[in-house]
Amino acid sequence: MAWYDEAVFYHIYPLGLTGAPTENTYGEPVHRLNTLLPWITHIREIGCNALYIGPLFESVGHGYETTDYKKLDSRLGDNEDLKAFVKACHENGVRVIFDGVFNHVGRDFFAFQDVKTNRENSAYKDWFCNVNFWGNNEYNDGFSYDNWGGYNLLVKLNQRNPAVRDYICDVIRFWVREFDVDGIRLDAADVLDFEFMRALRGVANEVKPEFWLMGEVIHGDYTRWVNEGTLHSVTNYHLHKALYSGHNDHNYFEIAHTVTRLYGMGGNRPDGLKLYNFVDNHDVERIYTKLNNKAHYAPVHVLLYTLPGVPSVYYGSEFGIEGKKEKFSDASLRPALSLDEYKDALNNNACTKLTAALGHIRQASKALSYGDYQQLLLTNRQYAFSRNTQDETAIVTVNNDDSDYVMTVPCGNHTVFYGMLTGQEVSAVNGTICVNVKANSGEIWLTNADKLFVADPAGGEASALVTDGGKDDAQGQQGKTEQGTTDGMKVKTEAEEERDQAETDRTRQNCGMEAGTGGMGAGSCGDRTELPETCTEAGNTKGAGYEQQGNAKDTGCEQPGNAKGAGYEQQGNANDEAHEAMDRALDEAFERGKIAGLQEAILAIMERNGNVTDRMRQDVYDNVYHDSLVNWVKSFR
């Protein structure tokens, strides 16, 4: 049981939260990081025990164009500030992971500056991809190079160069030695070279017990990254999209299908892949903005904290703040905030109280961290599932309807369950419990009485946390609901029941399910699952308007010397020159391949290995990133 298995993360984008300038003048350090010290207490108060913070290191602008991996960004302070901050986190029981931006660097990075000065004679010319001294760019460098995202201010590192790999591995060792960091979130992990990531995993295993590697992966088969030899976890963008759209559309089938598919990727692990779950971050719109019905904040967050995976809350979202993604700027997603503005949030902000309650409940329950997942009930508007360990069962019930709903769900051999948010106690009858789930709310039912935690950290009653849904809770309900009964509770009218049944039957028909079944059938309900908003769904091989990176040319990232340059483990005798030559030829062919050809190659290999479902086929066509597809096809070997 590693620390990250029971982690509840808080996510801070420090340049935004501290109000740092958007451009770095490389002047004297301004000690803004110290202003985040009071946030450590807040992080603990809302039930978090881990912090993902970044980017942190010297950069040109938004933090992802690193110029010095071993120096805190001068807009935030100096290295002593960062040491003190991590130490304070540890003293308060908060683990810390940094943002590791290793796919690309900024133009002021020392090695790139050397290439600009010494050109062909630079010792670092092979540190970057496809450097062409016959080309040019908008900076009039007199040469061209591969960039990231179409921006020449982001210079793509050649991760297959042993010197680059060794340098980055040394950076990780430095971060642990200097700052005592507990893990790293790998930026753009879905296009990082697999051999490079395996080298990072080797360093992670070496530098510190339970050092955690989590990667940013937008889509695809997460098991390609999450395994014993590569990363511990990746960002769960599939669930992120399902959580908000499943509530906006009143379609719990989408969420349940996504959960079932992702949980199945975990193989024999009862707790699944332990993906990094979130409802918003520094790249996507705030959940409070995304939700059509703000009352859905409650059931969305109940699911975030109880489904398989590691939950995370993005700074400010616990207050219910809004943030809409703009066409040419993410500034509205990364605002400066002051805790003084929210000093009474735990008393009068329903979003904050619910978030805090869920964080503490999550940490109190082993079942929510380690339990298996079993779906118990599913309609368009209601959803129930259990998380089970040998010693504890948690049953989670959510309702996205504007009316209360009475659920009867199986509960195994347990006799009594305790509502952690409402304080209710219900007794089992013939292996089932009957519970009332209030409108636009959720509840977590646990079997262990000694873990009972009635949710309001401020000392009031908790039922309003999941019924009001808004941010102002002055008129919240007082007093507990009656225990073990539905007397006096609002239930649906006959007309409402008929409406919901008709809607449910239509969904089941669309999903290929027989009426009256609670589980997913063989149909393709999940075919309606879309990509996150950061991606346009691609139903064809043209990439839906994406600029393809290097889709018709060699990357120029050949590994110098006689080291291997394939993104996979070499099979057979490493000294077999003919074998290596064949592998290099295949690599070059893949890297020159176009999007459509790479997709068809992946599908052909998958079909050779077994049956390919419509969902698997759609996953391939949804991936329209050249580098990601190249890594995918190499991962089969």
Where are each of the predicted segments found?
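Long, intrinsically disordered low-complexity tandem-repeat segments
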Residues: T517, A538-N575
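Active-site clefts of carbohydrate-active enzymes
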Residues: P270-N292
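Active-site groove signature of glycoside hydrolases
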Residues: H104, I168-F194, N277, N281
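Substrate-binding/active-site clefts of carbohydrate-active enzymes
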Residues: M1-F9, Y13-N49, L56-E178, L200-E206, ...
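Carbohydrate-interacting/catalytic domains
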Residues: M1-Y52, E58, A88, F319-Q483, ...
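Conserved, mostly hydrophobic/aromatic
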Residues: I12, I43, I53, Y69, ...
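Active-site-proximal helices and loops of the catalytic beta/alpha 8
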Residues: V86, H90-N92, K116, R177, ...
